[in-house]
Amino acid sequence: MRLFFLIAFAFFLSYCSAQVRVLNSDLFSSFEHLDSCLLRLYSPEEYPDFKVLHIGDSHVQGVYWGGQLRERLSENRNAKQSGFLFPYSAVKSYGPKGLKASLTGNWIGGNWLKENGITEFGLGGYSLKAVDESAKIDWQIEKTLFGDTVRYVGIWHKGNMRIDSTFLLLNHRLVEGCNIQYSLYLNTTLKREFSLESGCDGYQFFGLNLASDTDGFEYHKCGLVGAQFTHMIQSVDQWKNELKLWNPDLVILSFGTNEAYNGFMDTLAYENKVRDLMRAWNDEQPQSSFMVTAPPNTSSRNRIPPYENFMIRVWRRQCLENGWGYFDLHEAMGGDSSWSKWLKLGYMGTDQLHFKSSGYSLQADIVVHSIRSYVRDKWPGVQLVEEDWERETEALLASIYTMKNPLLDSPPQAKTRTHVVRSGETLSSIGRKYGIPYTAIQKANNLRGTTIYPGQKLRIPH
């Protein structure tokens, strides 16, 4: 009998340990305001169509984070659309690979950060404006970008345009109060090379969508390198009208990385703007659900971002007050200084601001695994099995959480001191303070130039 109880107790312990999750979503997420949205997402037979609109900074514009989010969110769904595309290289930005756009005639490009008073901007962040009627864009779509058949092409634009004669217009969407329109074409010859000409002086192009099927799951990522939330909020009235044009089921906002390094942050004004946008979108788009991901932990140029934790607090507070979903990516990574672990493990780029493909993929897996765990716990009847990649995510997080922080574990650097840069200081003034040439500080910190920033940590050699 005693042996029986010992075996039963051991089984109970093993069962309990199997239920323990490294990723305790309750600590850094709030999904209850997304209940109806998540039920639709994970009921594909009842709700076959589902649209996600993801807006943010360079983390979103890049390929890897959004690509992995799209793949994980669309599991067991019909996902036959590329999502929002823009020829970023045409406006001196980056990517996307596999989308070639050759511009002829006169075009003016711009984005939220570089307003020129000539071009307008949509939620995609970028635009191209034709200065004459002969302006043209020749497109080439490679299979590395979109492997499915290009049966449909959707275009966000303003003004009249001309497209190849083999393209038939199927649908043209306009929304009152929104300057942007969406035109959907049938590509009758399924070709991957076509031309788009401006049909009027002032024609504007905002984005492209490729599809082999117009039904099913859609994930549109609209990112802008260097973007801050305050850049987007400048046109809040336009955005709420454009949101009606998109009509998404779920909107995800991912800002805060660039603001975290802003040395001139008006914290009160920032939070008021966050609140204003949330209330406006709640009022104008009640059929959509909204979610925010907090910025990841970073350390660009060896600086501690002074407003990173402020961003996290503001977004969490306003999400709770306004009924938005929330995910604290900073905490899920491991909290303050966790960037050093991600860097050592090869997940983070050497700029200590962006992540490698493996890092972005892991972050996407963390977000979606957390959502799936919430759905399984809340609705046991939903057939959502735990996938192998979810267990692998748990294992990777366990190794990160239990790993010693390299910043604390590293031996002290011999013959060096640390100086935290203050506002107004230069390399020369710091060098004079310590009685050494500024070039010695440059060399000790691998600085290419003389630009330094408040909050940046510098090694000062003896």
Feature-to-residue mapping (PLM):
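Catalytic His-Asp segment of secreted/periplasmic serine-dependent ester chemistry enzymes
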Residues: 236, 298-407
